């Protein structure tokens, strides 16, 4: 046993959101973001929500709020901020330069959780592809932010491997992953056709993340799907047989849960779950 154990310091972050009209769900959305951040392994030390008609194109929040964030970072000892919407490359770069701290957004946090949860070959490929495509347009801001702070949230790929930061190598890796994905999906299609020929009805358990879908599947089928009081405890669909009282059988599949503000380009990370649902229509 080693004499000393080096533990990675827990990241301390401030959540930042924009409320664009009275009665919107900005507060609920930021509360959900807090759950995401905690699931990713960080601690929330502050929250700032600005009311404004439109998200600032350059810095997400207005200039005055950027100054407030500087003060809040100093007061709380925060190691970074997390914005409740996906930041553009310019917003990421400008905030990182203004605040001199690690800048993240909702998409980066979700991808980090996906990377930790993916267990199948297809899931890992889909997640890494989504992570690399997200990084490609943001290498400037992300590079400074992540390299200075030594990694942590946003640097972890599937299996805890460190994600590539070089543009040329990222493009090469994306091409390789696309080839691997086509092969994996070809095998999945063969399995789907076999299930279809069996004539057994298939049911997808669909709902919000952390709503209890895995618990329901375990209760009905005596499966042993991971149950946790965390967002995205399930990333890869699990299929089990349910025997009904009339000796009829159905196949039940646990799917990835829904969540607010999931960017369209990130839907690819849900491809497995979406394909599972399409089978049942």
Each PLM stretch: what is its role?
Residues 33, 132, 170:
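A residue-level signal for conserved active-site and pocket-lining positions in enzyme catalytic cores
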Residues 4-13, 142-268, 274-278:
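Conserved G1/Walker A P-loop phosphate-binding module
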Residues 125, 132-135, 139, 177, ...:
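Non-transmembrane amphipathic alpha-helical segments
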Residues 108-130:
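Short alpha-helix plus adjacent loop in nuclease-associated cores
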